[in-house]
């Protein structure tokens, strides 16, 4: 089982950097950062991918990604370039968390809010364009319903081959169908989900003979202590420390590393 931690883009740079340092030293497998410019709880935020680029130069082994990036929020060509750069800086440790977005206020302020089915369709098309930029060796033209590119080429390529992992963070039926096709992993929303949602995800993304998709669950330190055996038996293979305060998270990481992880590696 892999172990990770999620930090919030509403925390300050010092808090996030300290969590990343401790997580890297504790040999956690990944650190994920929420990717919001505004939330219902706070209008304070730092840009996730800018911070992850900085963390890439300050860590050695831990994978770095988002939980999750709303694909329709930014131009996909620019997002592809940003993540490829983080993958270069980290020597192949970038992870793209994939979502369609949910908080209308931040889209209204920074992007463009559209109905659910349009955001899902833009996510689908955006992922196609992003992965093509990551893998195409020659310039290409792209003309989709929402995005267009002429003579597009991305260099240098990401270090990871064929490209950085895509970890979907969604519970809706349409996005789960996309996850069936594209996902390398699935992560739950930070607030957590019900047992019924976990059962649905397991049924949709772990079909016999289907692609192997890493499935994760999350919780506070105490919640993980209680639930890891159950989720491991169900076939989940990623545990994410979440919902701890920025002040408590470094110590929780240390306790996770010393008291829990050795039993599952």
Region locations from a protein language model:
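Active-site-adjacent structural elements that line small-molecule/cofactor binding pockets in enzymes
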Residues: 1-265
């Amino acid at each position: 089982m892999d172990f990770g931690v999620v930090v919030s883009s509403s925390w300050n740079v010092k808090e996030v950097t300290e969590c990343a340092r401790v997580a890297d030293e504790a040999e956690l497998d990944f650190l994920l950062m929420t990717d919001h410019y505004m939330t219902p709880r706070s209008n304070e935020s730092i840009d996730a991918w800018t911070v992850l680029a900085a963390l890439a130069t300050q860590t050695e082994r831990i994978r770095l990604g988002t939980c999750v990036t709303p694909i329709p929020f930014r131009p996909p060509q620019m997002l592809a370039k940003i993540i490829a750069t983080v993958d270069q800086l980290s020597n192949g440790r970038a992870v793209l968390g994939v979502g369609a977005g949910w908080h209308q206020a931040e889209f209204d302020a920074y992007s463009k809010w559209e109905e659910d089915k349009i955001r899902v369709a833009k996510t689908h098309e955006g992922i196609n364009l992003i992965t093509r930029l990551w893998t195409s060796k020659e310039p290409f033209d792209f003309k989709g319903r929402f995005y267009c590119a002429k003579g597009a080429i991305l260099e240098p390529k990401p270090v990871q081959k064929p490209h950085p992992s895509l970890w979907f963070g969604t519970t809706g039926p349409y996005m789960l169908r996309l996850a069936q096709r594209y996902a390398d992993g699935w992560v739950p929303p930070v607030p957590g989900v019900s047992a019924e949602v976990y059962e649905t995800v397991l049924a949709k993304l772990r079909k016999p003979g289907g692609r192997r998709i890493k499935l994760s669950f999350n919780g506070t330190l105490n919640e993980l202590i209680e639930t890891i055996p159950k989720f491991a038996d169900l076939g989940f293979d990623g545990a994410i420390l979440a919902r701890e305060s920025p002040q408590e998270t470094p110590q929780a990481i240390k306790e996770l590393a010393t008291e829990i992880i050795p039993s599952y590696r």
